[in-house]
């Protein structure tokens, strides 16, 4: 795989984000940690999340695995972003103001990524979240043993420093009329998550003690925070 040459068939299909994995792997090998972080950031705004919770399909696609154990790509990604934080390379994404105002509905992974990229080109971004704190699935759907809440807050602080405004306990269409949002902002970006469980059509699925995972995780996390 070489991003500057001819792509081999399925050469980058192992990563849904199309991370430039061979490139930053090589940079880490050469001790070029800051360059590796900059390369990783081209395709992934939040490596500290994916480095901890991504199921790493890239490792399943790693050709080294044909002759032995695959490269531990997820661990390398984790080390790159933590090196970046420790050395002060992770900075708020700022740009000259465009005068455009954007409302982002939902503060899960999609909403946060949208806020990051829009702020990085100079738009004023307000993120609306119906829960009591931002983060969505990251905050309420993933336990601390996989993704500590301090890691999420660290990124939220950076986004706020970049100029992103978070408004929680607010549901568009209920607490604020959708028309009011349209009148106040130049555009709206809908980033709502899939919060309603589908359930399973089996006998006993409604028995006492059977809980949908997201409902259980959300309630459990709210009790802890």
What residues fall within each predicted segment?
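Ferredoxin-type iron-sulfur electron-transfer modules and their immediate structural context
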Residues: 1-101, 149, 190-220, 225
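Residues forming the flavin
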Residues: 77-225
């Amino acid at each position: 795989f070489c991003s500057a040459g001819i792509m081999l068939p399925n050469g980058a299909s192992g990563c849904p984000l199309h991370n430039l994995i061979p490139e930053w792997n090589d940079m880490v090998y050469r001790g070029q940690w800051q360059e590796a972080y900059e390369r990783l950031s081209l395709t992934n705004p939040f490596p500290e999340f994916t480095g901890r919770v991504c199921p790493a399909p890239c490792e399943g696609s790693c050709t080294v695995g044909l002759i032995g154990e695959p490269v531990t790509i997820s661990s390398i990604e984790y080390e790159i972003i933590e090196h970046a934080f420790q050395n002060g390379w992770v900075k708020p994404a700022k740009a000259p103001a465009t005068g455009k105002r954007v409302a982002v509905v939902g503060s899960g992974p999609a909403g946060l990524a949208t806020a990051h990229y829009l702020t990085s080109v100079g738009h004023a971004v307000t993120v609306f979240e119906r829960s009591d704190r931002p983060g969505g699935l990251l905050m309420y759907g993933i336990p601390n043993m996989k993704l500590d809440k301090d890691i999420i807050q660290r990124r939220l602080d950076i986004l706020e420093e970049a100029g992103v405004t978070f408004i929680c306990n607010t549901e568009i269409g209920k607490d604020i009329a959708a028309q009011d949002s349209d009148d106040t902002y130049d555009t709206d970006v809908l980033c709502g998550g899939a919060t309603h469980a589908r359930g399973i059509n089996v006998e006993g699925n409604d028995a006492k003690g059977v809980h949908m995972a997201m409902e259980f995780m959300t309630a459990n996390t709210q009790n802890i925070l």
